[in-house]
Amino acid sequence: MTRVADFAKDHRVHLLQGAQELFPALIEAMDAALSDIQFETYIFDFTGAGAQVAEALIRAAQRGVRTHLVVDGVGTGPLPKAWQQRMKSAGVQVRVYSPLGPLGLLLPHRWRRLHRKLCVVDGLVVFCGGINVLDDLYDPNYGDLDAPRFDFAVQATGSLAAQASRTMELLWWRMQAVRDVRLNRLPQAVRDLRA
């Protein structure tokens, strides 16, 4: 494990307040992506400003950028069909972390959730913090809000981005291995874990 002090030598950090600062920075980075985008979030809501982030992922995939999106099975739930189709057609690879089965959260092994809010672009820049992909002035359960949410994220460059990228890649392949096991593709699951 890399010590925190090791990161301080080669990284730059910029504090972003709310989605009104985070989303434009995210979109700018994704629009400039050359090789890959890794994105993980608990909530991805496709209303308002969240739709702009989704559009940036689609544009990147259409340019040939490897685009991975992981959303939580409770926080996001099933993606809207229209967005699912658009992302699939564009080449955005989407995985749902621990989707709910017929028994929902009654089974304790379903309580583990993906609360990370991370995006790594080209292994060079990482966005992380407490902000979901959710318009600051809209709540899916309550509608329009009177005031924006108060939350923060950081944009960082340097070795911290590469470390986050490796961690996200590991989750991606673990999820693929679990999927392969469920589909009785054990040899492929073993290969996925070695990737």
Task: State each model region's role.
Residues 1-195:
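Charged, low-complexity intrinsically disordered terminal segments
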